[in-house]
Amino acid sequence: MLIFNTFNQYLKYKYIKMSKYLVAYFSLAGDNYNVGVVKVGNTQLLAEHISNYLKADQFHIVGDNNYPPKYGDRIKQANKEKSQNFRPKLISQVNNFAQYETIFLGYPIWYSRPPMAVYTFLESYDFSGKNVYLFCTHEGSGQAGTFSHIKGLLPKAKVSTDGLVMQGAHARTPAAKQEAENWIKRLNC
C-alpha cells in the first residue's frame, strides 16, 4: 500500500505513472477535401482510435499559423508554407516528453509532405532512443514517401516505416477503428 504525506506527493506519483505512449497528431476540422465540413479532422479520428486502444496520452499539434476556413485557401497557404520552409510556433508543448517510450505521430499529407507544424514538433523534442510509429491520412497520394523522410529526420530514434496509411474519407468509417487496432497488434507494442 502506498502512503503519501502530501497531496503534492500524490500528484507527482500520479504524473510519473502516466502512459508510456504518446499519440501526437496534426489535424484540422472544418472544410476538408472529399468529406466536406467536419467537426473533427480525419487524422484526429485515427489518433483517437489509436490512443483509446493503447490508453495513450494525446497531443494535438497546433501551430500559431491560423488556416483559412475554405479548403482551397488552406491548401494555398500550406503550399506557401512548404515552399518557404516555414516553421510555425506550437501553441502548446508536451509536458515531460522524456517519459514517453513510444510516440505515434499522425498527420495528413499536404503536397506530399506533413504540414509544417509537424516539422516544428519534430525539431522541438529529443527523440533519441524512442520508438516512433507513423500514421497518415491522404486523399490519393498514399504516404508519399513521408515515412522514410521522417525516419531520415530522426536518426537517433527507432522509426518504423510500417505505418498506417488511410484515405481521409475512409478514416470516417466504422472499419477505420478496427484497421487501426489491427495495425497496432501487428506492431506488437
Tell what function each PLM region has.
Residues L11-T102, S112, Y119, Q178-C189:
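N-terminal beta1-alpha1-beta2 submodule of the flavodoxin-like/Rossmannoid cofactor-binding fold
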Residues L28-D31, D64-N66, I109-R113, H138-G142, ...:
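Solvent-exposed loop/turn segments at secondary-structure junctions
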Residues F97, E123-G129, L154-K156:
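Short, conserved loop/helix-junction motifs that constitute active-site signature segments
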Residues P114-V118, Q143-T146, A176:
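Residues at alpha-helix caps and immediate loop-helix transition turns in enzyme cores, especially N-
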